[in-house]
């Protein structure tokens, strides 16, 4: 029997609940339904687009003049957007001779002008026309469409957010046709605030440049100017790039920037290399972070400078950040320090600061204290920045009271990490609400104050919940104004610092109530599930998952973002507690995964196999049901994944599993 009967029942119940909660699309207004029907009839003519456009204009104007629809209603409706996009596509194909026609069709640009006049043009229509014009080499006309788009946006109730990067990318490509590109001119063209270089959609331009059908000469211009813009950001705007752009990057964009940096001939810049190292490790790409280090050391002739060595401490610390046993991770930090820093005649403040930061990442606050007392020279302890890093470590120590900490603070806190640590200690100390507000106002408001980070705002949410008159009705997203672009980052930080199950449940409910469904995604739910496991509450984690898949109208509720935290969470419970009963939970969620994926993702395999190996090493008592899951499902999937996709686990995992004679490890895995 492949799966246990109990596990099958659990999976079936989940799937039935999911299937029974399909949410229908909101109904359109009757007037729009009438217009949709008339337009569908008008557009039946597949050959004479000129006649179609004339009939379209007559139909829309007739409905408007009869008082059925206002310009505002037309601007807000998207019910006919796709059908009108097909007209643009048909025009393009007829002009290229792909579709026969008895008349000369209106061009996509002419159709767009009509749609703009009728208040029916949408962002995707501007994109289609710009793509058509760029493919035909008409950059100036494409930029004219961009200007029309900006006029259209000014009429809309709100900008279109991340999706706007496509039309911005087409405008950028048109600009690249015209000559040598300048990053400040491009930013101005895109109608973005001066100095906000992060708004330039470079990654989208990378994606689209080869998909438009540009001539070879124009494609060359685009590639050359794209490289020039990257170089200007990396070299001329290096400070902004390191401080603003890199910390907000996730993997695809970060990897793209690193490739551009690597392609710059003769550039050996340890500040940039260190920036890439730290940010790759920030998103968990530790192997790539080490590649950055090795590449930079090679370029530097085998002698890493102080900046690179300091970054190495951060990377090694983050490698051990999620380790169950952080003693070994601390030993690796000590090994790096002894190998790379002890040999220096003079160790500067920046390196001691990097060492303290590494220990703070590992939550080894006792080590922060001992390094401060035993290793750091007295004259360096007077350094303002180093002192604040040390005090950050003190703020996290449970044996340092809030009054003791406040006595040691400088008059003005200028390190945002220290400020956040102080706020967090206040949020976790009863009766400190007024003190919290006073410190926040002094540090983050007024002239010369610090800029709040996502962690700052997350800590305000934590304090807001702790002091709410009725926590059961507290809405996190009504409590503190959060910029739209920071919402996800603030949510992630809150879930890292929250250790209260009831607060996590309330945060989930607040998210459902306050955020649009495209924002309240499975990624967010996965983070909430992960947070529940981190505080040891697997029952809340499961309850949130089940509620999400049965009440959300997201297109795909069961995916890697929601399943991986469950599989990782139960695997970690097995590792921490040597508790084999959680294998039945893994069995359930593996079955769900098998219904979503043709191949079980590698992350699932690795987490589960590591948990099984731990049980075998500790000689845990497994039931027949457990052995059936391991042998019939896990081992067979590991073998198939290696054969089909080349997935290979650490050999030590298999070696540990073979200690249990009742588990049959396929020979090809050994």
Swiss-Prot record:
A GO CC term assigned to this protein in UniProt: mitochondrion
- The answer to whether UniProt assigns keyword Transit peptide to this entry is yes
Q: What top-level branch of life does the organism fall under? A: Eukaryota
Q: Which UniProt keywords apply?
A: DNA recombination, Meiosis, Mitochondrion, Transit peptide
Its main subcellular localisation, reduced to a broad class, is mitochondrion
Which segment of the chain is annotated as a signal peptide?
none
Tell me which Gene Ontology terms the entry assigns under biological process.
Answer: DNA recombination; meiotic cell cycle
> Keyword Plastid on this protein?
no
**Matching InterPro entries, A to Z?**
TPR-like_helical_dom_sf
Q: Where in the cell is it found?
A: Mitochondrion
User: Any idea which residues the transit peptide spans?
Assistant: 1-27
Please explain the role this protein plays, according to its UniProt record: May be involved in the control of meiotic sister-chromatid recombination.
Q: What is this protein called?
A: Meiotic sister-chromatid recombination protein 6, mitochondrial
Q: Which organism is it from?
A: Eremothecium gossypii (strain ATCC 10895 / CBS 109.51 / FGSC 9923 / NRRL Y-1056)
> What lineage does UniProt assign to this protein's organism?
Eukaryota, Fungi, Dikarya, Ascomycota, Saccharomycotina
In the UniProt record, the gene name given for this protein reads: MSC6
């Amino acid at each position: 029997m492949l799966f246990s009967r109990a596990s099958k029942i659990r999976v079936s119940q989940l799937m039935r609940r999911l299937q029974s909660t399909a949410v229908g699309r909101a109904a359109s207004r009757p007037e729009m339904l009438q217009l949709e029907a008339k337009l569908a009839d008008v557009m039946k003519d597949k050959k004479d687009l000129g006649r179609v456009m004339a009939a379209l204009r007559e139909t829309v104007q007739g409905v408007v003049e009869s008082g059925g629809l206002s310009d505002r209603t037309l601007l807000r409706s998207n019910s006919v957007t796709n059908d009108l996009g097909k007209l643009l596509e048909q025009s393009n194909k007829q002009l290229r001779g792909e579709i026969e026609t008895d008349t000369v069709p209106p061009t996509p640009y002419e159709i767009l002008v009509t749609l703009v006049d009728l208040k029916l043009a949408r962002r995707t229509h501007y994109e289609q026309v710009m793509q058509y014009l760029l493919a035909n080499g008409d950059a100036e006309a494409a930029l004219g469409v961009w200007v029309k788009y900006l006029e259209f946006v000014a009429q809309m109730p709100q900008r279109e957010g991340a999706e706007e990067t496509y039309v911005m990318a087409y405008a950028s490509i048109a600009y690249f046709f015209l000559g040598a590109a300048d990053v400040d001119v491009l930013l101005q063209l895109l109608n973005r605030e001066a100095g906000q270089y992060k708004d330039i959609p470079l990654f989208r331009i990378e994606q689209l440049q080869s998909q438009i059908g540009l001539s070879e000469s124009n494609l060359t211009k685009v590639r050359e100017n794209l490289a020039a813009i990257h170089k200007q950001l990396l070299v001329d705007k290096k400070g902004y790039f390191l401080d603003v752009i890199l910390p907000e990057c996730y993997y695809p964009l970060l990897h793209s920037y690193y490739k551009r940096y690597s392609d710059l001939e003769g550039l050996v810049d340890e500040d940039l290399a260190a920036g890439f190292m730290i940010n790759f490790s920030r998103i968990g790409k530790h192997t790539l972070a080490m590649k950055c280090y090795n590449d930079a050391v090679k370029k530097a002739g085998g002698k890493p400078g102080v900046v690179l060595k300091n970054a190495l401490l951060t990377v090694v610390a983050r490698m051990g950040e999620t380790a169950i046993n952080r003693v070994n991770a601390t030993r690796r930090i000590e090994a790096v320090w002894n190998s790379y820093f002890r040999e220096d005649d003079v160790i500067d403040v920046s390196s001691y600061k990097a060492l303290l930061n590494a220990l703070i990442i590992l939550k080894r606050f006792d080590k922060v204290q001992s390094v401060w007392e035993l290793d750091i020279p007295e004259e360096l302890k007077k350094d303002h920045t180093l002192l604040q890093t040390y005090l950050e470590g003190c703020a996290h120590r449970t044996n340092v009271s809030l009054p003791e900490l406040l006595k040691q603070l400088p008059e003005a806190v200028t390190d945002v990490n220290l400020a956040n640590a102080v706020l967090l200690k206040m949020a976790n100390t009863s009766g400190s609400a007024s003190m919290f507000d006073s410190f926040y106002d002094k540090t983050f408001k007024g002239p010369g104050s610090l800029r709040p980070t996502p962690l700052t705002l997350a800590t305000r949410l934590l304090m807001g919940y702790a002091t709410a008159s009725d926590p059961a009705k507290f809405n996190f997203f009504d409590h503190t104004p959060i910029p739209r672009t920071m919402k996800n980052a603030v949510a992630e930080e809150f879930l890292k610092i929250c250790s209260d199950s009831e607060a996590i449940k309330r945060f989930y409910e607040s998210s459902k109530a306050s955020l649009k469904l495209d924002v309240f995604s499975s990624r967010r739910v996965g983070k909430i599930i992960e947070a529940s496991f981190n505080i040891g509450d697997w029952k809340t984690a499961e309850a949130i998952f089940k509620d999400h898949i049965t009440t959300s109208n997201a297109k795909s509720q069961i995916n890697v973002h929601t399943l991986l935290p469950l599989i990782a969470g139960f695997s970690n419970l097995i590792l921490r507690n040597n508790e084999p009963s959680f294998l039945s939970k893994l069995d359930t969620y593996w079955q769900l995964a098998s219904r979503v994926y043709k191949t079980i993702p590698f992350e699932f395999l690795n987490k589960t196999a590591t948990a099984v190996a731990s049980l075998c090493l500790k000689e845990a008592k497994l039931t027949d049901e457990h052995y059936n899951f391991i042998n019939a499902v896990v081992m067979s999937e590991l073998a198939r994944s290696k054969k089909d996709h080349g997935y290979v686990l650490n050999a030590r995992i298999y070696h540990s599993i073979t200690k249990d004679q009742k588990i049959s490890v396929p020979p090809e895995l050994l």
